[in-house]
From Swiss-Prot:
This is Dephospho-CoA kinase. The lineage of its organism: Bacteria, Pseudomonadati, Pseudomonadota, Gammaproteobacteria, Enterobacterales. GO terms for molecular function: ATP binding; dephospho-CoA kinase activity. PROSITE patterns: DPCK. GO terms for biological process: coenzyme A biosynthetic process. InterPro entries: Depp_CoAkinase (IPR001977), P-loop_NTPase (IPR027417). Belongs to the CoaE family. Monomer. Forms homotrimers in the presence of sulfate. The trimeric form exists in solution in equilibrium with the monomeric form. One of its GO terms (cellular component) is cytoplasm. Coiled coil: none annotated. Pathway: Cofactor biosynthesis; coenzyme A biosynthesis; CoA from (R)-pantothenate: step 5/5. It is found in: Cytoplasm.
Amino acid sequence: MRYIVALTGGIGSGKSTVANAFADLGINVIDADIIARQVVEPGAPALHAIADHFGANMIAADGTLQRRALRERIFANPEEKNWLNALLHPLIQQETQHQIQQATSPYVLWVVPLLVENSLYKKANRVLVVDVSPETQLKRTMQRDDVTREHVEQILAAQATREARLAVADDVIDNNGAPDAIASDVARLHAHYLQLASQFVSQEKP
């Protein structure tokens, strides 16, 4: 068994920056979003199933998934969203477990944007939340993705609240300041997680 630290935060909170800082310290990072993209790569069985269910227009000329079209299709249709989740979630879970087993670092950092929404925090040994104010989320996301304030507000409304994320947190990184301020927080937490992982391994041994 591997000690799992789940990392989460709302859109624009800086999850990638924090994850990269842990990766720089030699920690294996398992990213749920990357795995979600991998299971629908061209040629993947799940992609064929999506085309069969939603129609061939969901697949671009180069064989990739038309993500925006799919998002628009399921956004206002809970039944279709449930169908898609039932298809993809087991595949994502299977690949996640595979990557955890392949990990070589003392603990793994599991990056899960929808950790709270999908109650996945129960699968982790510890939860780290990257916390920023909603206003910071708005500004960063508008700048990064070149989208309107209204668009970001819709995304925020669909995600778990800041309070809900903080309620499941064991550790919190305040990322309202400059990005380079994160390094010291990550170094401190890394030392703590190494200790916890070591204790976890010694308890696991028969």
